[in-house]
Amino acid sequence: MAALWLLFCLSSSVLTTTTATPQPVSASVISRHDLFVQIDPERHALLAADRLTIEAIPGRPLRLSLAGTLHLDRLALSQSPTDDIGRDLPFQIEREATAPFGQYITVPAALVTAGAMTLTAHYHGVIDDPPKEPRHLRFVTPSETAGHIGAEGVYLSSETQWYLDLPESLSRYRLRVALPSGWTAVTQGQRRSSAPCPAELCREAGLTLAEWETAEVSEALTLVANRFVETSREWASSGGQSVRLATYLFPEDAGLADEYLDATARYLDAYISLLGPYPFESFAVVENFFASGLGMPSFTLLGSGVIKRHYVQPYALGHEIVHSWIGNSVFNRVDRGNWVEGLTTYLANYYWHEWSGDHAQARDQRHLMLRGYNLHVPPERDYPLGQFTRKQDERDNAIGYQKAAMVFHVLRQEVGEESFWRSLKTLVAQYRGRHADWHDVERIFAETAAKDLRWFFAQWIEGTGAPALTLKNVTAHPLPRDADGRFSLSGSIAQTGPVFRSPLPILVRMSNSRQHLVSTQLSGADTLFKSDLPFKPLTIELDPEAMVLRRLARGDIPPVLNHYVTDTKRSVILAFGGSDTDSHPFQDVVKRIRSQDAQKAPGQRTAITTLAENALLPGEGSVL
């Protein structure tokens, strides 16, 4: 094997260049990978062979990406499906100046033939990018790594570029992975076998060879490995679909397996009824050696810290399971925005509570999403939902997840219950194994509901913001000559910013502890409403159940620390007098605030006073 590998290394024709801004030139795609990888965790090393089936466009070069730390030893063109040796292909290596860790392997256009081409690539190298703490808040992003092979674990994803790839490829995969004894590999699809690696295939003795294969196409293949304890069960949904459920946990957490398997079964059963058949043969919960919460086709990769904290809530495990349909079966066309995270948040973080009958928690979740958008996205920092691609900070999270989820809630009210859920099943069925964007979502909902929804998507997806509302000219008086003592209520709702179309429920609290709901439809700068009431009205409130997306007045948001953090005007009032050098419980906090403010303009700094200096609270801004 070693001699044969040396022959591969010596037989290829290679030219290396550097390009400043290489442009994609190939419309060819890879339809299948047949991969063998041998992994040495102690040396961070990978040895690989990949047999690629390419649907090629003749006359155009193939430009395949590969990690810059991997060395391509040989590239060969197979003359037939049974040709395992093939004819050597010359190739050019381009290293991108703006991404020094990446490289492109280019096959000249003259060698690219029409139809299916089979290439075999042999390569080796090191993948060693240890996970680092995120640059942003932990709840927004996981630990950062492009990929890592080490004694603590293996993580190889699309960002690792651990196999040759072409843009826009949706591929099927067969993967054989050899690892030291005691290690278990997990990837997408089904594991077909696991046995000692034969000597003719593996360079070292004592390795275990596992074979995995995907039935569905995927945008990328993620491979993880560690010293797992595997627990599995066969499960059938209430509709009869069979799915293999599994956990791959570290030995100290193996006792949590049944809790995760039970929760997985509950979520799958619910979402199969809502979205249609589960698109894969199995689902696994896999423990990771660094902080993560990632959903891949047929498994989720959760950091050890959250595994230990029983991460089975709807916003946690439920969210990753919904991604099985939304994002991992129907793919997002990221260059045209990201609808996947908002819909997944709506179905998992919110709708699970409504579906299970916990209406109080559902209401709280709507308020949470609405307040999150208002807290983290002031009007001057807003941007259209259609421009969201991924979250990097709280603002992105509030727009791409929370606002988007509320938009789907408003869409559900616009098209009605039956059309909304039928649209989702249609979307999942029609775009299984395909990319979809916001325009595809619009088309599906419009056709299913038989409604023109162009205005809706132009307003909520392509536009910015949400309606800012004010009650005006509200009056109530007894109805004349009414023996039942009824009252007439009227008024108007002014939109103080851009004009939106939106439903708006108004709650009227009356005498005798009665309530009355007035349904209105915002359609202009001022919307009139009128209603006859059976009792005297006492108070009136706009949308107390948070059913629609809107800008909230400051008084409508309960005091929370996030409001202070995101406010542009901040004050700190100390209950203890004296200077920073005096001893008081918040001395270190005050010093840190002053230190952070030192780099800001005077008008942007936090005002710090004591109760003795200022007996009145500031008239504006947040107070701590």
Segments predicted by a language model, with ranges:
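N-terminal, polar/Ser/Thr-rich
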Residues: 5-47, 73, 146, 167, ...
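Surface-exposed beta-strand/loop patches in extracellular or lumenal glycoproteins
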Residues: 51-69, 161-180, 439, 487-507, ...
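A surface-exposed beta-strand-loop module
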Residues: 63, 69-141, 199-205, 524-536
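Beta-strand-rich binding/interaction modules
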Residues: 73-76, 186, 453-454, 467-543
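Extended, low-hydrophobicity, Ser/Thr/Pro/Gly-biased non-transmembrane segments
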Residues: 119-228
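Short acidic/polar inter-strand loop motif in beta-rich domains
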Residues: 125-132, 544-557
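Hydrophobic alpha-helical and helix-loop surface patches within well-folded domains
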Residues: 212, 244-492
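Long, folded non-catalytic interaction modules
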Residues: 560-624
